[in-house]
Amino acid sequence: VGRRFFLAMPTIVILAAMLIRPAGLADVPAMTDTLNWAIEHTDVIFRASPASIAEREDYLRHIWKEDCPCLIAESDSGDYLGWALYDPYRDPRVWTGCYETTIYLSPTAQGQGAGTALLGALVDAARADDKVHSLLALIVSTNVASLKLHEKFGFENVGTLKEVCYKFDHWLSLTHLQLLV
């Protein structure tokens, strides 16, 4: 595979009837569907316009170029559950060692432990990755499930940007959480 974090952790992790594995280009359509569902039906992401598969393929290639993990959760029967990654926060030449997490679950997978499995694998990968010092999670303040999930893994609330996006007829605030790995 050739990316450092894969050398420090198993390529495939099986957790309680769930498989966590590296993402490939074949996963991009399902990943894009999940992202677009969140864009169109929730306020957990500020973006208002849907993503294209080509755009998300380019983004996955960028993640790989940055030597960062992008993970997929599948049920033991092979059903896609969601995805997670971390990538450099802003300009990595300035924000040395600082990476931002992203997690999206299929709407049918929410509340089944997929988020816990993905974030656990992501934190483990970050702890094994010499270039990572800090993980950030920028979460819409009304997304209580995601806030609690990150806090379960030791992320601490380090501040909130108030009313920074207007979507679905209301203002959204963005909570910043941080984990030093």
Task: Spell out what each predicted region is.
Residues 85-88, 93, 136-138, 151, ...:
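Conserved catalytic-core motifs of GNAT/GCN5-like acyltransferases
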Residues 19-31:
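A short beta-loop-alpha structural element at the N-terminal edge
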Residues 5, 11-14:
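Short, positively charged and aromatic/hydrophobic N-terminal segments
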Residues 110, 136-147:
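Conserved beta-strand-loop-alpha-helix junction that forms the acyl-donor binding cleft
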Residues 111-126, 148-152:
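Conserved acetyl-CoA-binding loop-helix of GNAT-fold acetyltransferases
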Residues 32-60:
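Conserved GNAT-fold acetyl-CoA-binding loop/helix
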Residues 50-108, 119-120, 125, 180:
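Acetyl-CoA-dependent GNAT
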Residues 126-139:
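Conserved GNAT acetyl-CoA-binding A-motif
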